């Protein structure tokens, strides 16, 4: 038996409802980001976040489950805003391992430039709060894993410099391109993070061969 399709008005109402939920979620994330940077995680008041987002605390708990869930969503929103996953996939799709590695470094620097203030707070928070560390370290481990894959391609192409093996080179490249390292350089030189690839790549050429054989 064929079922009647829902009326057009019903579908439109559902679409508007979903759009409203998404806008509410974004207001909460924006407010949470602001207060997280200003006061840190421990002093983060869900009541204040709710007030700024023009919702109730119940709405926050309904959407994010807990304060830690809200932190996780803020971190995920940062990655979504930056488009870092798509950027890394685009770099990995390059056939030349050297070009792919260069693109990965540039993408990483662009990622750090998305929201340096929030990155600083997340990194410092990860160092002192065990719960937050679990949320944030999983994302950093993803980045480190991505770096290892790009380095492995260079190793297969005989592009590692002595005395580096794949593991040594991967750890060194990951540390050199970490937010902490990049932020220190950018802050001292008063330049944007997305300009750091021009400095990092010559440094990393001491680990991997990025020029012609």
Residue spans for each PLM region:
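Basic, helix-initiating cap at the start of DNA-binding domains
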Residues: 1-55, 62-69
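Hydrophobic/aromatic-rich alpha-helical bundle segments in the mid-to-C-terminal region
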Residues: 155-203, 211-213
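Short, basic, alpha-helical segments at the C-terminal edge of helix-turn-helix-like DNA-binding modules
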Residues: 46, 75-82
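Short helix-capping/turn signature of helix-turn-helix
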Residues: 64, 124-129, 179
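Amphipathic alpha-helical packing segments from all-alpha helical-bundle domains
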Residues: 110-123, 131-157, 167-171, 202-209
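Alpha-helical DNA-contacting segments of helix-turn-helix folds
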Residues: 36, 71-78
């Amino acid at each position: 038996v064929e079922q009647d399709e829902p009326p057009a008005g019903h579908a439109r109402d559902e679409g508007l409802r979903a759009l409203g939920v998404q806008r509410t979620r974004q207001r909460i994330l924006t407010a949470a980001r602001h207060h997280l940077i200003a006061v840190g995680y421990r002093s983060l008041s869900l009541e204040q976040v709710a007030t700024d987002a023009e919702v109730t605390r119940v709405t926050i708990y309904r959407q994010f489950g807990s304060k830690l869930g809200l932190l996780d969503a803020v971190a995920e929103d940062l990655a979504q805003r930056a488009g870092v996953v798509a950027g890394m996939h685009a770099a990995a799709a390059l056939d030349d391992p050297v070009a792919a590695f260069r693109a990965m470094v540039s993408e990483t620097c662009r990622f750090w430039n998305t929201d340096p203030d929030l990155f600083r707070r997340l990194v410092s928070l990860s160092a002192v709060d065990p719960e937050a560390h679990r949320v944030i370290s999983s994302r950093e481990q993803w980045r480190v894993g991505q770096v290892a894959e790009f380095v492995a391609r260079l190793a297969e192409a005989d592009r590692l410099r002595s005395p580096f093996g794949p593991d040594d080179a991967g750890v060194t490249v990951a540390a050199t391109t970490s937010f902490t390292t990049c932020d220190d350089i950018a802050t001292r030189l008063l330049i944007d993070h997305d300009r750091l690839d021009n400095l990092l790549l010559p440094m990393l050429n001491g680990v991997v061969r990025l020029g012609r054989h």
